[in-house]
Amino acid sequence: MNNSVITVIGKDRVGIVYDVSKILAENRINILNISQQLMDDFFTMIILVDTSKCSKSRQEVLDLFAEESKKLALDIRMQNEEIFQAMHRI
């Protein structure tokens, strides 16, 4: 796995950064850069991560984020960095 971009969107509450960071740490996914912003009651975060030390397959990580999204009432998505950049190129 290469670098990936994780996006997190949800209603603002205490502990979102902790909850997402905990998942990453437990799976040996390193945060390279992080940006977060509040828009009214909505929390948004974009995280650039290095997944090279993660022992899970890309699909297993995607499935984990889908499961955790439901538990945490957040929209957590992960994309390959190159795909993310191509989709957001002007």
From Swiss-Prot:
Pfam families associated with the record: ACT_6
Listed transmembrane segments: none
Chain ranges of the ACT domain: 5-83
Family (UniProt): Belongs to the UPF0237 family.
Protein name: UPF0237 protein NMA1909
Lineage: Bacteria, Pseudomonadati, Pseudomonadota, Betaproteobacteria, Neisseriales
